[in-house]
């Protein structure tokens, strides 16, 4: 089961908010009211393994292809149209694949610290994150979000980011995500991501790239997105 928020469902103008690692739709708690006030319908799911969605205990249950399939099922179930996609971090790796499968359903795109890797390596920052995610004994999701935030979170906010992960058995999805990024040419989704880039090059709807300048994992990816889309 995939949990999602559906605010202002009567509106025909949809904003789809896809979160990344290791957060959940709580990430968008301050954005959603403003979008609703502007007359938008807001859909904000929790990816499988995160938030209030189901969580597999077996890390091997999580694959890039499975995440695309799980989120696509929700997308098809809701029968959304006229969508602006806001895709942050892993929300982009998943959301951009959904957009390129059905581009006519989207009216705009905002990419934030994300992209579609095609197996040509990773930044040193990402490699450090990958190593950390697999070796640290206490994978404290609230602390990770806190350390990556320019706005310092209070204790209640940190606790909210930790709430979906009461112990290590709930964190298989969060531990798995860094392993699933296509940073080598042997990854089984490289071909599909290359094909998705070809679709993105033809996407003519309004597109915006918003990247944090201190993000070491997606350094300079905003320039690539601006150039290609």
Language-model segments: what does each one mean?
Residues 118-177, 181, 188:
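Helix-rich cap/lid subdomain of alpha/beta-hydrolase
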Residues 1-7:
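A short loop-to-beta-strand scaffold at the N-terminal edge of the catalytic core in hydrolase folds
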Residues 204-229:
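Conserved loop-alpha-helix segment in the C-terminal half of the alpha/beta-hydrolase fold
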Residues 180-199:
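Active-site nucleophile elbow and catalytic-triad environment of alpha/beta-hydrolase enzymes
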Residues 80-121:
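Conserved hydrolase catalytic core segment
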Residues 27-29, 53-60, 120-123, 220-221:
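Conserved catalytic-core motifs of eukaryotic protein kinase domains, centered on the activation segment
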Residues 5, 37, 44-87:
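Active-site loop/oxyanion-hole signature of alpha/beta-hydrolase fold enzymes
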């Amino acid at each position: 089961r995939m949990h999602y928020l559906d605010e202002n469902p009567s509106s025909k103008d949809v904003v789809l908010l896809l979160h990344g690692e290791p957060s959940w739709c709580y990430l968008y708690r301050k954005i959603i009211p403003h979008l609703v006030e502007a007359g938008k319908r807001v859909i904000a799911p929790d990816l499988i393994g995160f938030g209030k969605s189901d969580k597999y205990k077996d890390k091997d249950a999580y694959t890039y292809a499975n995440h695309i399939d799980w989120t696509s099922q929700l997308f098809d179930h809701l029968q959304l149209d006229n969508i602006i996609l806001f895709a942050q971090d892993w929300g982009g790796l998943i959301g951009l694949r959904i957009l390129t499968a059905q581009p006519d359903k989207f009216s705009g795109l905002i990419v934030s610290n994300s992209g579609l890797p095609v197996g040509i390596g990773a930044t040193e920052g990402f490699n450090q994150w990958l190593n950390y995610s697999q070796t640290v004994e206490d994978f404290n999701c609230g602390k990770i979000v806190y350390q990556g935030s320019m706005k310092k979170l209070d204790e209640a906010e940190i606790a909210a980011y930790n709430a979906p992960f009461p112990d290590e058995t709930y964190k298989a999805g969060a531990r798995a995500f860094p392993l699933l990024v296509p940073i080598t040419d042997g990854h089984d989704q490289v071909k599909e991501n290359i094909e998705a880039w070809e679709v993105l090059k033809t996407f003519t709807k309004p597109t915006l790239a918003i990247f944090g300048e201190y993000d070491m994992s997606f350094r300079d990816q905003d320039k690539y997105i601006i150039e290609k889309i």
